[in-house]
């Protein structure tokens, strides 16, 4: 009986009639999360968290374990799919003013931070050359913290350099954090249903709502099918498209790769970090590139919620998307002219979007008042 009541509630969940395809990414993220936990479990069964055996255990999974290649590729490419969905989900939230649901937005930003931490720990686990050096560079940023930095870094590493204890604790963290993500996702969904979803018009949709099932479930299923198709096509035909060639070599602390870079979904933050010549300044900019999302609910000054009717903000939003892409591209290049200057200009423009947001809102209010 209780499960029937849940189904009835799910079917009767009132949702605005006019929400577009951009609102489908929440359910796609839920599907990605489920797939990552399942494939991750099957990989963890065969993985060995030891610096001498980790790389060999990945080779063993892909070569010897039945369908191990499928699990490994689904997990790795699934992570990229996860980030494509989450960045689109955040972009939709910024464009349509979903951040004004403060509790939902703040829990979502916390989820993003947890997801990025989990993905970072996971990238270290294969113990390839790029995994090792990316971990060295990123964890070394902790030393920029005054007084406590060196102690914290040694504590995180479990020694005076990245070694076996580091890999063991990164595996433990990579295994446990997804359960935190699942818990926080449940809270995120509960907080969302407290206020209800926004819509493309940014208006109150209480007078025009339809049941979630069957209308939006079928709509969600279409996008889920397309996502699964894209994922399986990539896994089958381009399994190494997101991999770094350096990571096919076992980690060697004595040989530094020519160009150290993390996975593509961290490149925008890494590009911002690299654009500042000062270590502490770069580390702060890296943290702020994510944390600045927390400010958006408090800096919204416009009387209009959605950017649908805000042409100036639309221009700024698409400039932000272009800036994000440029920083990602520049971060793949060596630290030399003109890439350094491009990164610095793009990083400045990235932060300018969030800084000028309240000023543009105030300006729009003035124009509307005079009209």
Swiss-Prot record:
Protein family (similarity comment): Belongs to the cytochrome b family.
Domain of life: Eukaryota
Keywords: Electron transport, Heme, Iron, Membrane, Metal-binding, Mitochondrion, Mitochondrion inner membrane, Respiratory chain, Transmembrane, Transmembrane helix, Transport, Ubiquinone
Cofactor note: Binds 2 heme b groups non-covalently.
Gene name, Swiss-Prot/TrEMBL: MT-CYB
InterPro entries for this protein: Cyt_b/b6_C, Cyt_b/b6_C_sf, Cyt_b/b6_N, Cytb/b6-like_sf, Cytochrome_b, Cytochrome_b_C_euk/bac, Cytochrome_b_N_euk/bac, Di-haem_cyt_TM
Membrane topology: Multi-pass membrane protein
Name the record gives this protein: Cytochrome b
Main location: mitochondrion
Record carries keyword Electron transport: yes
Positions contributing to a ubiquinone binding: 193
Cellular component aspect of the GO annotation: mitochondrial inner membrane; respiratory chain complex III
The keyword Repressor is annotated on this UniProt entry: no
